[in-house]
């Protein structure tokens, strides 16, 4: 569920305290009504509103926690994390620690708009780090492609999405986590990058 119409286009349009409270109450009521169904809330910085009310991982995790309901969690869309200027691996790690990471969308963009491009074609390094973060938090839920073909054959776009994601997860699987952890303690930044590059 993406609450993207909840937000503002201009200053003073909205009482933010009331808006958050109404959102919290509405989600809590829905979660209580069907406690057997998980409600996964997706955040986005903007579109269709200029500023969406729930626009980053922290706010969405806070809302999910504030409901007090185990069946309320967060959808992490890689492209939305980029657009919000988050580090997707950090967002995955944070949400994974809260046990509120329910669902993952994969796509890519240039951080300026939600272009829904084939994952890894723009931000390959970020994707490998993201895949490793999902592994480290033990994420075993759904990962779905949220890509838009634009001017390309939709079947080809889906094929390439799966090819790129297989490649990304294969590279992440090759990473020696103990070796990486030792290098991160110093940190040996360029030794780390050279090591990851050697696995590509």
Which residue stretches match the model-derived regions?
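Structural motif corresponding to the early beta-alpha repeats
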Residues: 1-18
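Short beta-strand segments at enzyme active-site cores
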Residues: 1-4, 38-42, 142-145
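Conserved radical SAM core fold
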Residues: 5-9, 46, 108-115
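Short, flexible/disordered intra-domain loops and linkers
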Residues: 9-14, 49-52, 118-121
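Generic structural signal for well-ordered, non-membrane alpha-helical segments
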Residues: 16, 20-23, 158
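Hydrophobic, aromatic-enriched interface-forming segments
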Residues: 22, 34-49
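Histidine-acidic metal/acid-base catalytic patches
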Residues: 25-29, 35-36, 54-76, 81-200
């Amino acid at each position: 569920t993406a609450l993207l119409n909840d937000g503002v286009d201009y200053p003073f349009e909205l009482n933010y305290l009331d808006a958050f409270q109404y959102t919290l109450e509405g989600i809590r009521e829905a979660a209580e009504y069907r406690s057997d169904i998980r409600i996964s809330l997706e955040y986005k910085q903007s579109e269709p509103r200029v500023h969406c009310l729930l626009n980053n991982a922290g706010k969405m995790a806070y809302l999910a926690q504030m409901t007090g309901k185990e069946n309320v969690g967060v959808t992490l869309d890689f492209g939305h994390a980029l657009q919000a200027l988050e580090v997707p691996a950090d967002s995955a790690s944070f949400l994974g620690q809260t046990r509120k990471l329910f669902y993952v969308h994969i796509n890519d963009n240039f951080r300026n708009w939600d272009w829904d491009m084939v994952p890894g074609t723009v931000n390959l390094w970020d994707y490998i780090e993201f895949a490793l973060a999902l592994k480290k938090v033990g994420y075993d839920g759904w990962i779905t492609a949220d890509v838009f073909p634009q001017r390309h054959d939709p079947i080809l776009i889906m094929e390439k999405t799966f090819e790129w994601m297989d490649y990304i997860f294969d590279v992440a699987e090759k990473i020696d986590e103990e070796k990486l952890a030792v290098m991160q303690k110093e940190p040996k930044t360029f030794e780390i990058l050279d090591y990851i590059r050697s696995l590509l």
